[in-house]
């Protein structure tokens, strides 16, 4: 999971057309996030492997995986919010 999150953050920081969708994906999967999960948008805009990684995370949202994910993404939360409209 760490490699996927790091890759997605690099995509966001590249400031391309994919930055917004990747920032949205990362923020939406945080526990208690105010961002709405928009699977159809992600499916259309994101890389298939990254999309599947987020789906797997959703399936395991009540396990330790979600807390591991939160620890990885939380330090970037403020930065990611700048990319989401």
Give residue ranges: language-model regions.
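Low-complexity intrinsically disordered segments
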Residues: 65-85
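Short alpha-helix boundary/capping elements
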Residues: 16-19, 30-37, 46-51, 62
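Generic structural signal for hydrophobic core residues of well-folded globular domains
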Residues: 12, 29-33, 57-61, 83
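Short terminal alpha-helical segments
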Residues: 1-27
């Amino acid at each position: 999971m760490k490699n996927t999150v790091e890759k997605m953050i690099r995509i966001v920081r590249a400031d391309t057309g994919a930055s917004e969708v990747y920032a949205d994906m990362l923020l939406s999967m945080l526990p208690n996030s105010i961002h709405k999960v928009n699977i159809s948008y992600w499916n259309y805009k994101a890389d298939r492997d990254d999309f599947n990684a987020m789906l797997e995370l959703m399936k395991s949202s009540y396990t330790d995986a979600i807390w591991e994910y939160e620890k990885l993404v939380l330090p970037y939360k403020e930065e990611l919010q700048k990319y989401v409209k």
